[in-house]
Amino acid sequence: MSPLLRSIFNITKIFNQYASHDCDGTTLSKKDLKNLLEREFGEILRKPHDPETVDLVLELQDRDRDGLIDFHEFLAIVFKVAAACYYALGQASGLNEKEAKCERKGNPLQDRRREDQRRFEPQDRQLEERRLKRQELEELAEEEELREKQVRREQRLQRREQEEYGGEEELQQRPKGRELEELLNREQRFERQEQRERQRLQVEQQQRQRGELRERQEEVQLQKRETQELQRERLEEEQQLQKQKRGLEERLLEQERREQELRRKEQERREQQLRQEQEEATQEEISERGESRTSRCQWQLESEADARQRKVYSRPHRQEQQSRRQEQELLERQQEQQISEEVQSLQEDQGRQRLKQEQRYDQNWRWQLEEESQRRRYTLYAKPAQREQVREEEQLRLKEEKLQREKRRQERERQYREVELQREEERLQREEEQLQREEREKRRRQEREKQYLEKVELWEEEQLQREEREKRRQEREKQYLEKVELREEEQLQRQEREKRRQERERQYLEKVELQEEEQLQREEREKRRQERERQYLEKVELQEEEQLQRQEREKRRQEREKQYLEKVELQEEEQLQRQERQKRRQEREKQYLEKVELQEEEQLQRQEREKRRQERERQYLEKVELQEEEQVQRQEREKRRQERERQYLEKELQRQEERLQEEEQLLREEREKRRQERERQYLEKVELQEEEQLQREEREKRRQERERQYLEKEELQRQEERLQREKEQLQREDREKRRQVRERKYLEEELQQEEDRLQREKQLLREDREKRQYLEKVELQREEEQLQREKRRQERERQYREEELLREEERLHRKEQQLQREECEKRRRQELERQLEEEELQRLDRKRQFRDDDQHQNEVRNSRVYSKHRENKEKSRQLDDSWVRESQFQQDLRPLQDEQEEKREREQEWRSRQKRDSQFPAEQLLEREQQKETERRDRKFREEEQLLKGQREEKIRYLEEDRKFREEEQQLRRLEREQQLRQERDRKFREELSRQERDRKFREEEQLLQEREEQLRRQERDRKFREEEQLLQEREEQLRRQERDRKFREEEQLLQEREEQLRRQERDRKFREEEQQLRLLEREQQLRQERNRKFREEQLLREREEQLRLQEGEPQLRQKRDRKFHEEEQLLQEREEQLRRQERDRKFREEAQILKEREEQLRRQERDRKFREEEQLLQEREELRRQEREPQLRQERDRKFREEEQLLQEREKLRRQEREPQLRQERDRKFHEEEQLLQEREEQLRRQERDRKFREEAQLLQEREEQLRRQERDRKFREEEQLLQEREEQLRRQERDRKFREEEQLLQEREEQLRRQERDRKFREEEQLLKESEEQLRRQERDRKFHEKEHLLREREEQQLRRQELEGVFSQEEQLRRAEQEEEQRRQRQRDRKFLEEEQSLQREREEEKRRVQEQDRKFLEQEEQLHREEQEELRRRQQLDQQYRAEEQFAREEKRRRQEQELRQEEQRRRQERERKFREEEQLRRQQQEEQKRRQERDVQQSRRQVWEEDKGRRQVLEAGKRQFASAPVRSSPLYEYIQEQRSQYRP
């Protein structure tokens, strides 16, 4: 076994091991996949037990989000892991370095390495993205370490301040005479410490500058190396392209050599063929002279056939050569396409390398930004003057670095553009060379075709000459051929006559075989009926036992539920009581219902199923349309993304577009040529088809002539058969007379058996009455009413029969009383047979009622046979029969009641499960235990069923023995009666003549009734056909309307999304512009504030010098003047801000209004155009459907009519041939079959309902588990993201961000939950509808087979009529087919024309859309470049999101594309929300900074005032205290103390 096969075997083995654990054996649950990842891939994954890693793999793996991982998804992750291992192996063994050395030396493994690189390129990209993520995480860790260092420094400063604060307190406690000396010493110490700190900062700054120089030098070296690598790669690419060119040229030369060789061989073959034909012609002339007339004739026929073949095959020969040329052209195009793909892959490799270089540069830039942030932190410890100086130096340095970066970026872009221009020039050169090659190839092809056409013309001229010679030979021997044809026609006629004779014999044998098969089928049906009756009795008993078992199960289930549901128990008990009351009420109502209501319910169910099927189809269509929309949106986004990536090459793209347009023009011309070629070929095919059609018509005419002759003979045969049937009818009438005599004796014996049977049934009924006493009253009332109706009917019949008896007594008054009863019984039986036949046609849908009526009729017949003293027994028997009917009706109702009870039980179980799921998640274990218990009970039930079956079989054997004994007794009695009948035969002969006359009249009346019924059926069938056609038209109209509305809504939605996207882009652009303006204003404001601050400081110094001379009122005036100045300045700023905001809002509203109007106009135009096109398409489809459906409907209607006619004839035959017991047996058999079918269907429905509910519950449990896992995973992801944001942001943003994320999380969870619920609901409805439709189809298939079996006999009798009808239908179909072909050709031309127009319009729209998107993207990029560079966190998040987007996009291309759109939409929404959130945060930050700045200004003003006031006060106290200096020194009013307090307030946490 090869390593590949062994690996595949191991993969499938592992999958099957885990899949067979808990699921259906074909898929993995997420829990099993998690275990598999942790166990099998633990050594490969970086953190195998990390929940983040495993959950991320699970989220990426389950692309269809069904909670299960199938084998395809499992294979995808296995291949990803294998690719990761391959990449890790290369890194560990240092393959990359060795391969780089080999490349410099010209290693021969270079091509193989490129192929591997191309093959594993997506995996390498993903690994690169993961490596970048790890680097970013490491950078975050470094930032955290820096923050911790800063915190430690701040703590040291705080401790130092605390020490100083303690020293100050000690100074205050010391004597006041030493305070000034200690204060001076402390100031000196503080200055020395500051000096040391400045020296240390300078040393650190020098070290950083040296490190920066080293890094810049390294960066320059890296750039040099990268440029060298790029040059080397460019050289390698050029070498590879040259190799490819050489390979292409060699292939083209080789191909030309092959074509020349083929042409040479073909020319030699043609020359050889011409020589052979010339030799054959000479031989034929020689043989003509020597051979006889017959041989010449035969040779002539063969030569004619050859000539026809050559004519026919000359055209395919040309077509074959043409197809060969087309194949060669296709091969050349494929080779060219392959070369272009290879060139494109090389360009993509270079683009990826450039992206890597840019990423490295961005990382270096981030590192420099971090160092700058560290420098800013260090400056916080310096004094204000030093901080100001350092800040200015940093600003200058930042500007210089920004300029340098901008220069480097421009230099890179310039180099990149130069490289791109060179590539573009190379590509243009290649395209020009390609065009030149194509032109050369075209000239060669044209020359070859010209040569070939010349040869073909020569060959055709020679062919024409041969045909002329053949025509001369044909004219010479034409007379002889006519004679030969006459002989052949005579021979054909003889063969046809022989075939007809054989066909008649075969048909006769088939009829005989059919009769034998019918006899066997009747016997089998009788056996099946008996078997079904036995099974029916068994099922009745089983149903009773099942009812008891269900009640026991219900009790146990309620006991178990009481343990877990204390509060819910009361509600469930009330529900159960209500259901029991409802059940009793329904049972009382159902006793009065008949089978008609059941049929109406079935009709309603069918209608509901039809509605559900339509709803499912509509949902399916909507899903398909949604998928198509998502596909369109994906394509549009892909185009936009590609266009954004190529913005910096706008001019080059425009030139490329012009070239592409020219190439497309050429391609369109080529397509037009191909289309014309296809049309020419199609016309040739049409001509061939017309020739074949003419031949078919000729054959059809001959066939019709033969069939006409055959039908005439068949008509003669039918007349003979009709005469024979009349003879047989007479014989049957004779046999019927004899049968009636025998039946009289048989009835007496049957009456005795009936009495015994009734006694046994009475005993069984008594047992049943003991079980069902609670239903007796209601059933008795119903039976009494039925008995009264039955008595009235019997009274009418009795009067009629008494009149008949009186007439018979007048004619046969000399006969004995016994004979009179027999004669009366005979006439009554004949009358009853006629009534039974009519009732059977009328009551096919009410078979239960028919059986009851039949039993009553039998009772009446028995009462007439017996004497009057048995009338009391008859009443008791009627009562017993009523009890039998009652028991049977109850048995019939029992399955329905059981089904309803089971439904209620299932509903209760479902509700209780829902409540348990909401309150007790641990109840899943109980459900599994219940499932095991149900399986155990089912096993016990099957064992009990087998025992009961054995008991029933013993009972049936006992009844069979009794029946045989009675039959023997009846045989003995029959022999005795036959002796008596022989004596009376002479007397009855005269009576039989009169009876025959009555029978004839009876048959005539019966025939009239049949004709009326036939007419009614025809009318009913036509009415149904019209209704069906009308329904079909309405459905089609409704579907068209729905389709049109759906497309209209989709178009509106697409336009709205586009408008929303444009508005969003415009709004983001304006927001960024406003942000930039606000930042500029803030900077100006800061400069203004700085200028004001310096001005105030100078003013304060001047004021301090003049403060001694001024009075106390002057500081107050100055403060008032400063306050007014600040207030006015603040008012001016607020007004300017308000004016800017109003102007911005006004511009935004105007632009939004203009965009809205334009988009509305475009949407209206597009909607009207598409609406017109859709209406036209729908009309065409409707006409096509109607044309296709009309012949089918007509055939279906005729077929149904013939089947119904055959059914009626078959029933009439069976009624005439079979006896009354057979009719009864057939009726009972059908009834039992239907009962059994109903029970089987109900049992199957119950089973399906149980399985469906079980699957739904299991699915609900899985969905809940999946939902919990998703929530847990989302929660962890959000918590981690929140932690990162909290570290990066300041303390004042925490509360606001937390609230915003919680609201966003709630919204997403609600939307996700709603989508999941909607999807699950639709899936369950579809599954249920599919089951119902499958059940309906199976039922229809079974009914159809049953009808087909019954109709076989009648179809064969009417074979001749069908032939005639089929011939008419065939001719109509031929005409319709021709019309459809012509219509299809016309539609094809119209479709081609429309397709070309649509293609051109789509091309124009695409180009306009492309330009608009390019313009918008260009503006967007220009605005993005102006954003603030210090937004590091936003940049990092965007990179992470883009990397995730690319990884998910690559993964989704390998798997199912249907889910990609949803994920991308969520990703875009998240980015949009993130962008808006950041914008709101920044705006809020800006407001906070402004407020903080105002507060700081106010605090500075107050502080300066308080400082001035305290200095004045201190000076006054010093001047006043001349006698007692240092007595009360103002320690807290010094500027040094205020400075310390300010520093402490800044660094205090």
From Swiss-Prot:
One GO MF term: calcium ion binding
Entries under Gene3D superfamilies matching the protein: EF-hand
Region (Disordered): 97-125, 157-180, 262-359, 404-448, 782-803, 839-942, 980-1000, 1489-1549
Region (14 X 28 AA approximate tandem repeats): 413-832
Subunit structure: Homodimer.
Record family assignment: Belongs to the S100-fused protein family.
Biological role: Intermediate filament-associated protein that associates in regular arrays with keratin intermediate filaments (KIF) of the inner root sheath cells of the hair follicle and the granular layer of the epidermis. It later becomes cross-linked to KIF by isodipeptide bonds. It may serve as scaffold protein, together with involucrin, in the organization of the cell envelope or even anchor the cell envelope to the KIF network. It may be involved in its own calcium-dependent postsynthetic processing during terminal differentiation.
Gene Ontology terms: biological process: intermediate filament organization; keratinization
Gene: TCHH
PANTHER family linked to this entry: TRICHOHYALIN
Family matches, as InterPro entries: EF-hand-dom_pair, EF_Hand_1_Ca_BS, EF_hand_dom, S-100_dom, S100/CaBP7/8-like_CS, S100_Ca-bd_sub, TCHH
PROSITE patterns reported for this sequence: EF_HAND_1, EF_HAND_2, S100_CABP
Biased composition (Basic and acidic residues): 171-180, 262-278, 317-335, 349-359, 850-884, 895-918, 925-942, 1489-1523
Stated name of the protein: Trichohyalin
Region (23 X 23 AA approximate tandem repeats): 938-1507
